[in-house]
């Protein structure tokens, strides 16, 4: 049986819109992503609401600060029983390690996942704006190696780096792929996109899918279609 899961990105600006959307998924045990837009505008009540519905939470806040601040931020989030929290690999080894330490200290099973390069970033943008001279793939692999050294649970990357990340860090090192689109979907602001089947073939553990599901006329049907392709 596959351990792969589809995570639905709840890219809404209100709890009311979120609840109306989730009501379409009666009898489905979901894994959902709460990002900055939803969390910052609605606060902790959105975590309570989704947990009360029995869904798993990927809290994608991309924490990036000094190690002590990130430690206490993660520690504070442990009381809400979130399943995944993201931190920026660019924060460095100590910051990443302190994020994981906060989970250990609270005796929780929350996964800490590192952000490598955003799927909206092209190689040219990375090289000219971030002043990173390597290839984009090498930058992602370097961040993944750092994440492994820091003892966190995995990373977020595009589909196209996934297999090499697994080869470098082992199959138990989790990889989450955003930027998932079906053939007929608009790629929007994503530059490095792929299909659910691509992600499956590249050995991803999770895919994050937002607009292709949330903007569809039948979100449940589209979710189940994508789930069949990936899981």
From Swiss-Prot:
Its EC number is 4.1.1.23. InterPro entries: Aldolase_TIM (IPR013785), OMPdecase (IPR014732), OMPdecase_AS (IPR018089), OMPdecase_bac (IPR047596), OMPdeCOase_dom (IPR001754), RibuloseP-bd_barrel (IPR011060). Substrate binds at residues 11, 33, 60-69, 119, 181, 190, 210-211. It is an enzyme of class 4 (lyase). It catalyses: orotidine 5'-phosphate + H(+) = UMP + CO2. GO terms for molecular function: orotidine-5'-phosphate decarboxylase activity. The active site is at residue 62. Pfam families: OMPdecase. Keywords: Decarboxylase, Lyase, Pyrimidine biosynthesis. Belongs to the OMP decarboxylase family. Type 1 subfamily. Catalyzes the decarboxylation of orotidine 5'-monophosphate (OMP) to uridine 5'-monophosphate (UMP). This is Orotidine 5'-phosphate decarboxylase. The lineage of its organism: Bacteria, Bacillati, Mycoplasmatota, Mycoplasmoidales, Mycoplasmoidaceae. The gene is pyrF.
């Amino acid at each position: 049986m596959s351990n792969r899961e589809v995570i639905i990105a709840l890219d809404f600006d209100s709890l009311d819109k979120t609840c109306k959307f989730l009501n379409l998924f009666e009898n489905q045990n979901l894994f959902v992503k709460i990002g900055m837009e939803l969390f910052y505008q609605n606060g902790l009540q959105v975590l309570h609401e989704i947990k009360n519905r029995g869904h798993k939470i990927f809290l994608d806040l991309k924490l990036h600060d000094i190690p002590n601040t990130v430690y206490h931020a993660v520690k504070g989030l442990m009381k809400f029983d979130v399943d995944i929290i993201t931190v920026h690999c660019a924060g460095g080894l100590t910051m990443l390690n302190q994020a994981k330490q906060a989970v250990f200290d609270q005796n929780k099973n929350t996964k800490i996942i590192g952000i490598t390069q955003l799927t909206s970033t092209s190689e040219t943008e990375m090289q000219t704006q971030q002043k990173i001279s390597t290839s984009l793939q090498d930058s992602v692999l370097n961040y993944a190696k750092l994440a492994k050294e820091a003892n966190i649970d995995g990373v977020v990357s595009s589909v196209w780096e996934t297999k090499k990340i697994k080869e470098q860090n082992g199959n138990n090192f989790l990889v989450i792929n955003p930027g998932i689109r079906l053939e007929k979907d608009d790629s929007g602001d994503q530059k490095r996109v792929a299909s659910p089947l691509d992600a499956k073939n590249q050995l991803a553990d999770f895919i994050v899918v937002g607009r292709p599901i949330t903007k569809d006329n039948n979100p449940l049907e589209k979710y189940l279609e994508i789930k069949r392709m990936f899981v």
